[in-house]
Amino acid sequence: MTQQRPLSHVMVVEDDRDTREVVKLILEMEGMGVTEAADGFEALDRLHKLRELDPHRPCAIVLDIMMPRCSGAEFRKRQLDDPLIADVPIIVLSAIADQLRTDDLHAFARVAKPFDPDQLIKVVRRACDESVES
């Protein structure tokens, strides 16, 4: 039996392994493929590899802000400076999300931790739908 590729593929960038695993599980239960990264540098590397395989993947990035080595803000700056990956929308998932203006990061949306799984799913689906349309 051939395994079908998920319709939506999302990258989750989160330094806390437990949170990353929970987000991954929630998205996979919704039929989405997930690529994980523990910080911004790892995310940039994996994002390039995904884009080389398929220019439409991932359809969105769920991004923590407070991470060691390369923060979410630094990741976003580097992402926007790179034409190959600049168009992938981000969803800020952070305990400080309420203090951030998504305009500052050109984010698609923000979800505050602790998060409601249904809200996260709805926002990710909307980002992926809009990403596919553009």
Predicted regions and their residues:
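Two-component/phosphorelay signaling modules centered on CheY-like receiver
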Residues: 17-36
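Conserved acidic carboxylate
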Residues: 14
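Acidic, metal-coordinating helix/loop segments flanking the phosphotransfer/catalytic sites
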Residues: 36-60
